[in-house]
Amino acid sequence: MLVRHAKAVSDSGGSDRARELTDSGRKDAARVGSWLSGRLSSADAAWSSSAVRARQTFEAIAERLSFPVRVDLRDDLYDAGPDDLLELVREADDSVAVLVVVGHNPTIERLQAWLSDDDRGFPAGAVAILEFEGPWADLDPGDARLVAFTVP
């Protein structure tokens, strides 16, 4: 599952990594969490960019889920391009059936388009649920099927 962080403030007065969600971004992420609660029964692993806005998006979503999810905050997701993110996903343990990745555009949008051959755009707060059969290490562009997509 790929998640683009929800709408963030345009200027934090500090670093880009410190930008927080706007009030509407928080509400959007909570709405997405409610939408996901009816579609997911578990998540084996969750990765989020260490940027504040991505972490806040994950937290707002996780609060609405009916199961606990522990997140791994990853610095490498902040600057990752689509090739980099695909390589990281390929390194996921095969015991992970459901992987949640919260990140940034253009990376999330491009990876979703590569994996599913569906280039629909990826607005702030959007979520794509993809299915893939096989070991993570074998995941290549065009191998996944987009089964659900929502925009808050």
Each language-model region and where it sits:
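Glycine-rich phosphate-binding loop signature in dinucleotide/nucleotide-binding domains
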Residues: 39-42, 92-97
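Active-site-proximal alpha-helix that buttresses catalytic centers in soluble enzyme cores
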Residues: 1-76, 80-84, 119-122
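Short, flexible active-site-adjacent loop segments at beta-strand->alpha-helix junctions, enriched
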Residues: 6-7, 52, 77, 105-107, ...
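Short, surface-exposed amphipathic charged segments that create phosphate/polyanion-binding patches used
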Residues: 86-92
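A glycine-rich beta-strand to alpha-helix segment
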Residues: 96-114
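Domain-level recognition of soluble alpha/beta enzyme cores
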Residues: 118-152
